[in-house]
């Protein structure tokens, strides 16, 4: 069957979130003119959090995560690790020069009518779709790698500017073992 860019991006977002269910949003929070939050997409409670005395006298707050676990965290991390290879060695390698921790997957439909890229960092999943409302070829050699990856690269470079580079979160019990690509050792 068919899917949408939003559903596909949500699925990749689930992987990078350790296999936990996510709900995409366009608006995360709305505050009134006095700084009071009147809408918050993230409904998790922060029990015991109080900023009245400032944060310095409190331990780091812990948010209760009640999201459904959709896949095993280890399996999700393995998928993320494989998709990281798309950036390092595959069809997304043109943006590896950004010096960010990224992963993703390109896609191109038959006859090059659509090109897409779903990419993510440890904190943000983004879907890019390039195509016409009435399907027709994008052009010779126009693929997800050539039309969608550069758009993702421009966006993620801007969105990540000034933020610390962090690795993908590895669940407990996962050991990384380097394997030589030619010898398998």
Task: Report residues per predicted region.
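A penicillin-recognizing enzyme superfamily signal
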Residues: 1-185
